[in-house]
């Protein structure tokens, strides 16, 4: 296995080193080929490394900085003034080829702004997109993009998102010709605004993307398609609504299983199965949103992620780096554009 180096914004998120450092140690235990550069306040980081095994410490490097991008920083302000922040330095490690990927649980807007400026977009990509997984009844992940990086998108941008999402699914899940759909207000060809209509026409003119047509909101979790494309306004609302519904269902299930002696007895008997179902509904199980379309790999973790959830984001970054995702997207876009122009 080829050695990989990840850069972690150790100070990002609600919990900082309390979560990021233990998660990094667990990642090193899982992947013997992995090296991790922790960027942040060395004094705070060292607290969580005191009990670490020597063989793990040998694969950790610390780059000290006491500057942090706060959750309240506006993206433009962070880009202009937080030039020595843990987030920016972690991204610069990817830009300078010292790391193959970066993971941060910090300010999403600042992360996207810094990544776009420092890493630049791939040839043929107008805007990067934020993409993550949703659960489905088929037990396989469904990729949804964009999740908020671009509030409004033209048809060409939606087309590019479809290509990037398809390649991501192929790379991470090793799925041949994943099914791609555009999220719309109806499945009929006449439905939707001009941007969605024109994006559909572009996708219908290439055989390299397995475009299946429109999909409505009630089919998002069906598993009938692998990649769902929309603008960032719709995608972000869809994601946050999904997380809210998942929390509601978990709450209602737990409350229902504690009412009455007989129900509590049955709950104990089927506890392992209940736990498995709750795990599948837990948003942390799908933690890690990829900012794709850049010349480097950037993965965004939930700000409130715990150690296990943050480890999931690290694992996603490892997989994307192993598959060389940016190169795959670049090659596929070039091939499709050449095909269309001919």
Curated annotation (Swiss-Prot):
GO terms for cellular component: cytoplasm. Transmembrane segments: none annotated. It is an enzyme of class 2 (transferase). GO terms for molecular function: phosphate:acyl-[acyl carrier protein] acyltransferase activity. It catalyses: a fatty acyl-[ACP] + phosphate = an acyl phosphate + holo-[ACP]. It is found in: Cytoplasm. Its main location: cytoplasm. Pfam families: FA_synthesis. Pathway: Lipid metabolism; phospholipid metabolism. It comes from the Bacteria. SUPFAM superfamilies: Isocitrate/Isopropylmalate dehydrogenase-like. Homodimer. Probably interacts with PlsY. Catalyzes the reversible formation of acyl-phosphate (acyl-PO(4)) from acyl-[acyl-carrier-protein] (acyl-ACP). This enzyme utilizes acyl-ACP as fatty acyl donor, but not acyl-CoA. Belongs to the PlsX family. HAMAP family: PlsX (MF_00019). This is Phosphate acyltransferase. It comes from Shewanella baltica (strain OS155 / ATCC BAA-1091).
């Amino acid at each position: 296995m080829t050695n990989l180096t990840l850069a972690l914004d150790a100070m990002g998120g609600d919990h900082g080193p309390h979560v990021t450092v233990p998660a990094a140690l667990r990642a090193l235990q899982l992947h013997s080929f992995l090296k991790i550069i922790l960027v942040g306040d060395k004094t705070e980081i060292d607290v969580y490394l005191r009990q670490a095994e020597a063989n793990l410490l040998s694969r950790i490097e610390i780059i000290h900085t006491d500057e942090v991008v706060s959750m309240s920083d506006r993206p433009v302000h962070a880009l202009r003034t937080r030039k020595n922040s843990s987030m920016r330095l972690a991204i610069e490690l990817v830009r300078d080829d010292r790391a193959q990927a970066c993971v941060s649980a910090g300010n999403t807007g600042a992360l996207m702004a810094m990544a776009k400026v420092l890493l630049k977009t791939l040839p043929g990509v107008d805007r990067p997109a934020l993409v993550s997984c949703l659960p489905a009844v088929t037990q396989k992940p469904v990729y949804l993009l964009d999740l908020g990086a671009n509030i409004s998108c033209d048809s060409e941008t939606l087309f590019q998102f479809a290509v990037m999402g398809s390649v991501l699914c192929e790379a991470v899940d090793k799925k041949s010709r994943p099914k791609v759909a555009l999220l719309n207000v109806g499945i009929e060809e006449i439905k939707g605004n001009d941007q969605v209509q024109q994006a559909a026409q572009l996708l219908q003119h290439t055989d390299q993307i397995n475009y299946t047509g429109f999909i409505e909101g009630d089919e998002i979790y069906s598993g009938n398609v692998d990649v769902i494309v929309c603008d960032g306004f719709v995608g972000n609302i869809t994601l946050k609504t999904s997380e809210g519904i998942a929390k509601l269902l978990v709450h209602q299930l737990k409350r229902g299983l504690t009412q009455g002696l007989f129900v509590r007895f049955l709950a104990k008997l089927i506890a392992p199965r209940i736990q498995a179902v709750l795990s599948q509904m837990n948003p942390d199980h799908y933690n890690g949103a990829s900012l794709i379309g850049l010349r480097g790999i950037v993965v965004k973790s939930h700000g409130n992620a715990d150690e296990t959830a943050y480890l999931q984001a690290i694992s996603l970054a490892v997989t994307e780096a192993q598959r060389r995702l940016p190169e795959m997207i670049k090659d596929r876009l070039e091939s499709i554009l050449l095909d269309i122009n001919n």
